[in-house]
Amino acid sequence: MTDRRHVMATASRPAGGWTDEAALAAVTDTLGLGVAYEILDGGSPARVYRATTSAGEDLAVKVLVPAPGAVDGHDLVSFRRKLGQIELLRTLAPRLAAHYLPIVHVVDGDGWSACTTPFYDSADLAAPLRESPQGTQEFFDRYTALVGALVLDGYAVQSHPTPAGYVAETVVGRFLRRLPVLRAALPADLMTAERLTVNGVPCEAPHLVLERLAGRLAQVAPARLMAPAHGDANTRNVLLSARPDAAAEDFRLIDPRGSTEPWDPVYDLAKTLFSLSVWDPALRLGFSVRRSQRYGYRVGFRQPAFPGYRAAIHRFLPHLESCESLSGLFRDDPGWLQRLLLTHDLHVLAEAPCRLSDRKPKPDLRGRDSAPAELALGHYLLGTLLINDLARQLGRAGHVDAGSHLALVTDHLPSG
């Protein structure tokens, strides 16, 4: 918003350096806020709190003190660029921008940043799938409204030529650039192994599979790039109004990617699918990982995944194919569904190093926390399983069967 208040915090750097708590205190002192409680939902390393102004206005306060070595997307530069992306969309795509929660304050400190938005009483996009056996239809009603807004009011307002090597640089390269962070944190025998077995399936290390896939990437490149409508459309970045009479169109967006460059809408579609298949269940349920000499790695969730998620995953691609808002968009982009599956698998792999910068507790349904390294390991192993299956199917049939591919993370996981 052009009328947002941008201030510099004047608090002195603490002797031991900035912590989340010290930065929050600086924000509340600067803005005169009273903190009610921490909001633990969300997947980024930023800490989020509900707070109140002296005038009684409810706000959400997001504070980021980046961890050393944080990957792109979890660093301070990305945090600050998110605000610039929202600002751009208010001019470029005002109908979509109306769905973004407005930024009320921006506070920059010495090596940290914070922002505030109005507090929005809400649930995440996937909440209907957890709450009711009938929630699958409600989810798709809501998701159809979201896709319509993102595509028709957002992505479609611009069209740009796709540069050569786009998929290799943006989709595959995102994981490869983060791989050194993962190698420094996970067991050396795993990260140096060229071959491993995951859930009974012999696999190659992901970077080797991606080398073999390099020659196929141009075949699934986007026909065009479009406006930077979001770029991180996971289910927790879409807030559904908690009002009982809320319509499907009553949602708010938060936390875009932090880029004003042209973008591929398939990236966001794949991010939502990834949220349902691996990311959100992992954060809510935790991973169970076992290893033996005979069977290799066995990875699944600690408890069975939500039935609504499984149903939505298997309906996801058929639903997208039937969406009117997408039919025209991808009419001359025959590789979009195969690109979506590739991007989904790379989201799983690229998320592994992200989880290492977790700052908030991640309790499962029984209250047991998941350590950052546990979440990183689970994502890496399931991503390894998926990318190997994708490469096998492409080599055997020239295309990927979505049902059998996604069944690897919905129907065939060992129980915790």
Question: Which sequence ranges carry the predicted segments?
Answer:
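Juxta-kinase regulatory segment immediately upstream of eukaryotic protein kinase catalytic domains
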Residues: 2-38
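ATP-binding glycine-rich phosphate-binding loop
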Residues: 26-56
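Active-site acidic catalytic loop and adjacent metal/ATP-binding pocket
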Residues: 44-53, 211-265
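ATP-binding glycine-rich loop module of kinase domains
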Residues: 45-83, 127-132
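Conserved kinase catalytic-core helix
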Residues: 88-94, 123-190, 206-222
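Short beta-strand micro-motifs within the conserved protein kinase catalytic domain, predominantly
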Residues: 99-113
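Active-site activation/catalytic loop segments of kinase-like enzymes and analogous catalytic loops
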Residues: 250, 257-326, 345-363
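ATP/Mg2+ or Mg2+-diphosphate-binding catalytic cores
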Residues: 304-416
